[in-house]
Amino acid sequence: MDSITVKASATSANLGAGFDVMGIALESPGDIIRVEKADELSIVVKGRGAEGIPADPEKNTAGLVALAMDKKVRITIKSGIRPGSGLGSSAAPAAGTAVAINELFSLGYSKEELVWIAARGEMAAAGIVHADNVAPCIMGGLTLVCNNYVEHVELPPMGVVAVLPEIVVSTKSARGILPQQVPLQEMVLNVSKAAMLMAGVVKKDPVIIGRSLSDTFNEKYRSPLIKGYGSVREAALDSGAYGVAISGSGPTMLALCPEDRSFDVAAAMRKKFEEAGVVSEAYVTCIGKGVRIINRDEEE
């Protein structure tokens, strides 16, 4: 085998109170990543937002992963996730490349090990090593990251709506507005929300999961960056969503809902963005299964 192609889908980190800890995989949108054995490391970026994604391996999340794995490959990324969307646009190439190189060279890394290799790639986008997007991208479902551990949890079936307004929020700038210290009562409330969310997961109760999505940290400080946030959130809940959260650093707003209400929730959210003078697009999707191999090319 001299090349391999994988699909790495979007992810949504934080889920409200699970800041830098929780994340879920979405079935769509996603990147298509082809990795070929080569004499030197190189990257080609095509697709959505390609003009703003560096091809220099030392400045690209996929490139940093290849360097960490010490493999000379040609990486072709067909981007389907808009950069600066809060949907793990930098994590998808990192996660996909880690899985592809592991398979292409038969390295034998576990999914957990691949998560931490892929997390190194996030240095190119966020300036820090963090795994809350690459973990669900690789493992699928819901993941929780704690120190050097990652846990995977299956979620009950539910619809997922991700509405992306035409507002750009970079991970670095969104992190910059967060305070280094928070009041004790806010911390207690956030911990209770995170605990309640996991109670909903254990009980497989999407209603409990949904009402636990709001928080007093990520939402409080980042929602002002999203024009129309309050009315969009209210419209989603009025249309039957279990709960709403800012996806990652934003500006995408994520709604979990009954599968048969997904399109109604998406339409209501987009309408409120439109009333606020903001163009948006919606992804009506479901919980994803993680990076998957879509093609293996054998040597001739």
Swiss-Prot record:
<dbReference type="GO" id="GO:0004413">
    <property type="term" value="F:homoserine kinase activity"/>
</dbReference>
<dbReference type="Pfam" id="PF08544">
    <property type="entry name" value="GHMP_kinases_C"/>
</dbReference>
<dbReference type="InterPro" id="IPR014721">
    <property type="entry name" value="Ribsml_uS5_D2-typ_fold_subgr"/>
</dbReference>
<dbReference type="InterPro" id="IPR006204">
    <property type="entry name" value="GHMP_kinase_N_dom"/>
</dbReference>
<dbReference type="InterPro" id="IPR013750">
    <property type="entry name" value="GHMP_kinase_C_dom"/>
</dbReference>
<dbReference type="GO" id="GO:0005737">
    <property type="term" value="C:cytoplasm"/>
</dbReference>
<comment type="similarity">
    <text>Belongs to the GHMP kinase family. Homoserine kinase subfamily.</text>
</comment>
<dbReference type="InterPro" id="IPR020568">
    <property type="entry name" value="Ribosomal_Su5_D2-typ_SF"/>
</dbReference>
<feature type="binding site">
    <location>
        <begin position="82"/>
        <end position="92"/>
    </location>
    <ligand>
        <name>ATP</name>
    </ligand>
</feature>
<keyword id="KW-0418">Kinase</keyword>
<keyword id="KW-0791">Threonine biosynthesis</keyword>
<keyword id="KW-0963">Cytoplasm</keyword>
<dbReference type="InterPro" id="IPR036554">
    <property type="entry name" value="GHMP_kinase_C_sf"/>
</dbReference>
<keyword id="KW-0808">Transferase</keyword>
<protein>
    <recommendedName>
        <fullName>Homoserine kinase</fullName>
        <ecNumber>2.7.1.39</ecNumber>
    </recommendedName>
</protein>
<dbReference type="InterPro" id="IPR000870">
    <property type="entry name" value="Homoserine_kinase"/>
</dbReference>
<comment type="pathway">
    <text>Amino-acid biosynthesis; L-threonine biosynthesis; L-threonine from L-aspartate: step 4/5.</text>
</comment>
<dbReference type="Pfam" id="PF00288">
    <property type="entry name" value="GHMP_kinases_N"/>
</dbReference>
<keyword id="KW-0028">Amino-acid biosynthesis</keyword>
<keyword id="KW-0547">Nucleotide-binding</keyword>
<dbReference type="GO" id="GO:0009088">
    <property type="term" value="P:threonine biosynthetic process"/>
</dbReference>
<keyword id="KW-0067">ATP-binding</keyword>
<comment type="function">
    <text>Catalyzes the ATP-dependent phosphorylation of L-homoserine to L-homoserine phosphate.</text>
</comment>
<dbReference type="GO" id="GO:0005524">
    <property type="term" value="F:ATP binding"/>
</dbReference>
